[in-house]
Amino acid sequence: MVKVGVLKMGASGTALLVEYLLNERADRGDITVRVVTSGAKMQPEEAEVAEKLKAFDPDLVIVVSPNAALPGPKAAREAFEGKPVIVISDAPAKKAKDEFKEKGFGYILVNADSMIGARREFLDPTEMALFNADVVKVLAATGAFRLVQEAIDGVIDALKEGKTPELPQVIVTAERAVAAGNFKNPYARAKAMAAYYIAEKVADIDVKGCFIEQDPQKYIPLVASAHEMMRVAAIEADRAREIEKGSDSVYRTPHSKDGKILKKFSLMENHSKQ
């Protein structure tokens, strides 16, 4: 039994579902999971939630946050130095990539898990929820979540075998996400890539709207347009999956009870092991 600890700081699309990607039917017998979170806050003092996770004594620690280069997420992961740690974050965390390597941390950086348009004049709880729903659809339908899932499962498999795991060093680009999506139809693949690229660009617009522009007449339309872009990305990602449904070629990779990844394309066919 591998004990997986998940520490979440702040909000990101991947953080919403990461533990469920490992046990979608709640019937795996090879892992047990505990999750602690600091909620929306990411200040260094919030990293004290790591102490609660230490009591679980995890075999593998996953630290999920936006911009893992910030002091708060840094303090959280360093609390587990000496254990296998995987950092899951977004494109701005690339600034800390060399540090991750030096400290022996694995990383999965999801380019399309873009920051939200956090201007008070625009962002309310409803808008926040809708944006994250769109992000989740993009990451799920393009294949990005599968890439995250398989990278973590590889580490779990090594730990089950008593081996020292090789921690992932993955930047989830559009090409890598869509490869994991394993699309059969080239138009579905193209739509998935378009969705991912649009979602990536959302971060650039929101950075400008949240941190650069100071005039409300300029920054409000910017963050609103970024959210419209993510909505369009989610629509295109959904269309990609619908094309695959039409040809009965949706790629599925459920877990067996012993944690093995199964695979299938046709809806009615039996699974085979990867």
Each language-model region and where it sits:
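Anaerobic metallocofactor- and corrinoid-dependent redox/one-carbon enzyme cores
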Residues: M1-P58, V64-Q274
